[in-house]
Every structure is written in C-alpha cells, then in structure tokens.
Amino acid sequence: MASKQKGPTLKGTRRLKSLSLGHKLALGPHAQLLFDEMLHAADAQLYASTIILAATIVDVALHECEEGEEGLGLAYLTAPERKALDWLRGRRNGLVHYKGVVSGMGKSAKDVTAIANDAERALQSVIPLMETLENYG
C-alpha cells in the first residue's frame, strides 16, 4: 500500500497462526510458502497482498498434491464457505486484473478501511479450508 496511513490489525491471523504452529497443516511446499507470506503481509497491514495471497493459497492448496493423487476439492465445505471462497476469488481478480478503480485502492481513510475489511474477510474465508487441512496434517 503506497499510503503511509495504517489501518486496523487483522484478527484472522491469530487463528491462522495457531493452525500453522508445529506445521500441523497438510500444505505442500508451494502453499506453505504462500501461507507464511500471507501471514507476514497481514501483520504488516499489506491488505491487497493479503487478499491476493489468500486467494492464491486456496487455488494451490486445492491442487497441490503428491504425484498420482487427486486434489482436495471443496466438497467438504458448506455452501456459505464455498460462497466465501468465490467472493475471495472475485475480489482477488478485481485487484490483479485492472478494469478500472475498485473499492479500497485509493488513499483516503475510507479506502484503507474498505481494503482492511476485505483483507479480514479474505482471512476469514480461508480459515475453514485451513482447519480441514489441519485435520489431514
């Protein structure tokens, strides 16, 4: 974020960090690196980066698997959890595929609050997937 204006601390990092302690998550090396960087971005209040990394982790975690195995899929998630991941993908796409100004990308306090809220929502969206991966770990 080019602005020096800092927004709120993201609360979702606490739950995600507790899941990552002791490497309990069944993440491959690619997803694990992205996961760690997402947590660092969230702590640094890099909200757009947090959203982009969260959505990317979902894609990688669902498709990264041992040779000969199938990816995890989303069948075990509830409809609201899948809807949250759909929102996350759409929000990430709005950030990385420029088609005009999107909410939260300005320098005003309102924009900082908007992107911070979306970053928090992004973290909350990936928690159910990470909790499932903890069970597989």
List the predicted regions and their residue ranges.
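Single-residue recognition of alpha-helix boundary sites
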Residues: 56, 70, 102-104
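Generic recognition of short, well-ordered alpha-helical interface segments
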Residues: 33, 49-52, 90, 121
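Charge-enriched, short contiguous segments at helix-coil
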Residues: 80-137
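Short, hydrophobic, well-ordered secondary-structure elements
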Residues: 39, 43-66
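Charged alpha-helical initiation segments
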Residues: 1-46
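Alpha-helix N-cap/helix-start motif at coil-to-helix transitions, marked by capping-box chemistry
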Residues: 25-29, 52, 82, 86-89
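A short, mixed-charge helix-start or loop-turn motif at secondary-structure junctions
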Residues: 19-21, 74, 108
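Short non-catalytic regulatory patches outside canonical folded cores
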Residues: 60-88, 98
